[in-house]
């Protein structure tokens, strides 16, 4: 073997720990050294660096600069990139979703609207003692035995028909009773006047009369009075009273 051939042979021979293995190319030798003789444990590397802090062996540098290391790094990038894109797209889509406006109370739940009844169509948002429902008035007991009561006969239709349609009118709601010149700024004012302003001027008959002398305007009012004050007497109760 010539000197050049011997030098070439020994140049690709592993000398780590008396290994002595020969490789055809330098790349194969480096790969062998990296896989079998270089410890990649961080604790071992840190210990070696503390023992020899002035320099780093070229084999450790080549460990991170070889084609195999670069291919591994590219593979990791390809695996991470789709996950990153999916995360970004999902965060953007969540950011575009509009949330429903909150109410002043802070709840997403819409406020409950009370049911509208015929008697509440002209009811004030802040009802006063003058704004009883018509059905509630029917249930009230009569204060006397007479079959007449006083009540305003001004209906909601009459109030609306008397409303001034001129937008510049300060008090558009006028009382429809002939001779009355009262005017009001809102429907609550004219409603209160309609129920109280002419109460003593109009008499309404209460045709439904109880045997006790109480009179009511409707059969419903009389029935409510009878159920509460004159309940039917059962046969068993009559027998107990006769004993």
Curated annotation (Swiss-Prot):
Compartments, as annotated in UniProt:
Nucleus
Q: Specify the protein name.
A: Juxtaposed with another zinc finger protein 1
Biased amino acid composition, Low complexity: 118-130
- One MF annotation (Gene Ontology) recorded for this entry: transcription corepressor activity
Gene3D superfamilies xrefs:
Classic Zinc Finger (3.30.160.60)
Question: Which UniProt keywords are listed?
Answer: Lipid metabolism, Metal-binding, Nucleus, Phosphoprotein, Repeat, Transcription, Transcription regulation, Zinc, Zinc-finger
Q: Which residues carry this modification: Phosphothreonine?
A: 109, 113
- Specify whether Nucleus is a keyword of the entry: yes
Span list, region Required for interaction with NR2C2: 39-79
In which tissues has expression of this protein been reported? Expressed in range of tissues with highest expression levels in testis, liver, muscle and fat and lowest levels in kidney. Detected in liver and white adipose tissue (at protein level).
Primary site of residence: nucleus
